[in-house]
Amino acid sequence: MSNIDLLKIEEAVKMILEAVGEDVNREGLLDTPKRVAKMYAEMFSGLHEDAKDYFRTVFHEDHEELVLVKDIPFYSMCEHHLVPFYGKAHVAYIPNDGIVAGLSKLGRAVETIARRPQLQERITSSVADTIMEMLAPKGVYVVIEAEHMCMTMRGLKKPGSKTVTSVARGVYEEDEVKRREVLSFIQMS
């Protein structure tokens, strides 16, 4: 959090409230700039973290088949409108030479990459590319489904609509059977 200028955020929030015609001195808004600054520091904490750090410790196991962590909840902020989007990520990889990561590391990588002004497409690619670089697996497949408040609260105003993005790396780019297999596991309840 030390790289985030909380006072600057507080001033900006005051300016926004004044610009929309609010009285920043009324009781309900007195601490709002401070609360918003703390919230942004938390929501953008991924700007000052590197998801690769989670994969510096690996394990060597006799396993070279699918590893899938499903339904990883996440939230992020749309970089176009600075409103939230949230959903779940499904992260799969096939280990190479038995190199595996702790399962929680996949969720932590999603969280770190999502906690910054973002696009869903970039989160999907960044998660896959981070795993490819750090674990050198035979393949990675990432699917993210999310609801975007910029489509729910404004513009299109379609609550409940979901955006789905996917990225295939390694064997998943070339092998349709493997792709279908991982998608069938993702769709299982």
UniProtKB/Swiss-Prot annotation:
Report which reactions are catalysed by this protein: GTP + H2O = 7,8-dihydroneopterin 3'-triphosphate + formate + H(+)
Q: Which GO annotations describe the biological process of this protein?
A: one-carbon metabolic process; tetrahydrobiopterin biosynthetic process; tetrahydrofolate biosynthetic process
Per the UniProt entry, what species is this protein from, by scientific name?
Lysinibacillus sphaericus (strain C3-41)
Q: Which domain of life, per UniProt?
A: Bacteria
Q: What is its EC number?
A: 3.5.4.16
Q: What GO annotations for molecular function exist for this entry? A: GTP binding; GTP cyclohydrolase I activity; zinc ion binding
Q: What Gene3D superfamilies does this protein map onto?
A: 1.10.286.10, 3.30.1130.10
UniProt KW Zinc keyword: yes
Q: Please name the HAMAP family in this protein's record.
A: FolE (MF_00223)
Question: Its quaternary structure?
Answer: Homomer.
Q: Which family does it belong to?
A: Belongs to the GTP cyclohydrolase I family.
The answer to whether the entry has keyword Zinc is yes
Which keywords, in A-to-Z order, does the entry hold?
GTP-binding, Hydrolase, Metal-binding, Nucleotide-binding, One-carbon metabolism, Zinc
Tell me the PANTHER family matching this sequence.
GTP CYCLOHYDROLASE 1, GTP CYCLOHYDROLASE I
Q: Where does Zn(2+) bind?
A: C78, H81, C150
Q: What is this protein called?
A: GTP cyclohydrolase 1
